[in-house]
Amino acid sequence: MERIDHIAIVVTNINHAVNWYTKNRDCEVIYQDKSWAELQFENIKLALVLPQDHPAHIAFVDESLENGTKHRNGTESIYEHDTFGNIIERIKYEQDNRS
């Protein structure tokens, strides 16, 4: 069975969005920079992204992924569209960097 890694939603201001979610919801910030932030909830991660830097999407862990784009946090991923045009990210973690 596949596992959903995170859902990414578009916001217009990362700091404002992080402040709102951490103040109004029970979550913690696990990563934040100028273009995106990642919040950990009990059962899922929520990515807050800027529209000019990242698309809104849903990410699934895919340990069989090969030849994806490598990211500075040790993950590898590719983006694709489902049959309805929604953006899907397939993401693979390094063995020692699993979230």
Enumerate the language-model features and the residues they cover.
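Vicinal oxygen chelate
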Residues: 9, 66-99
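Short, conserved charged micro-motifs
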Residues: 16-19, 65-69
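Core segments of cupin and vicinal oxygen chelate
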Residues: 1-2, 8-46
